[in-house]
């Protein structure tokens, strides 16, 4: 799927970004290259291939370098919300920014 210049300008508008025509054309090229790469990856037949956490697992045994998931500190919501300008029912209140 290739984007058009109109698509890039619409996306910029929705993101509330000002973008000059030259920048939009440059971004169009970059996005289309990215989408081309994604299409190439999607075209690869991966049926029957087990997902890997580390591709090197195919060559050698890899020990997971992940730590045990354990609680190391207790978060006190009241202490964290005390400096906030507005809090209600444990939630931070912020001004409306999008209509």
Swiss-Prot record:
Which Gene3D superfamilies does the UniProt record give?
Glu-tRNAGln amidotransferase C subunit, N-terminal domain
Its domain of life reads: Bacteria
Q: Which SUPFAM superfamilies does the entry mention? A: Glu-tRNAGln amidotransferase C subunit (SSF141000)
EC identifiers of the protein: 6.3.5.-
Q: Which GO terms describe its molecular function?
A: asparaginyl-tRNA synthase (glutamine-hydrolyzing) activity; ATP binding; glutaminyl-tRNA synthase (glutamine-hydrolyzing) activity
Q: Which InterPro entries match?
A: Asp/Glu-ADT_sf_sub_c (IPR036113), GatC (IPR003837)
The answer on whether this UniProt entry bears the keyword Nucleus reads no
What is the reaction catalyzed? L-glutamyl-tRNA(Gln) + L-glutamine + ATP + H2O = L-glutaminyl-tRNA(Gln) + L-glutamate + ADP + phosphate + H(+); L-aspartyl-tRNA(Asn) + L-glutamine + ATP + H2O = L-asparaginyl-tRNA(Asn) + L-glutamate + ADP + phosphate + 2 H(+)
Q: Which GO terms describe its biological process?
A: glutaminyl-tRNAGln biosynthesis via transamidation; regulation of translational fidelity; translation
Q: Name one Pfam family in it.
A: GatC
Name the family. Belongs to the GatC family.
Q: What does this protein do?
A: Allows the formation of correctly charged Asn-tRNA(Asn) or Gln-tRNA(Gln) through the transamidation of misacylated Asp-tRNA(Asn) or Glu-tRNA(Gln) in organisms which lack either or both of asparaginyl-tRNA or glutaminyl-tRNA synthetases. The reaction takes place in the presence of glutamine and ATP through an activated phospho-Asp-tRNA(Asn) or phospho-Glu-tRNA(Gln).
Task: Provide the assembly information.
Answer: Heterotrimer of A, B and C subunits.
Q: What is this protein called?
A: Aspartyl/glutamyl-tRNA(Asn/Gln) amidotransferase subunit C
Q: What is the organism of origin for this protein?
A: Burkholderia lata (strain ATCC 17760 / DSM 23089 / LMG 22485 / NCIMB 9086 / R18194 / 383)
Q: What is the lineage of its organism?
A: Bacteria, Pseudomonadati, Pseudomonadota, Betaproteobacteria, Burkholderiales
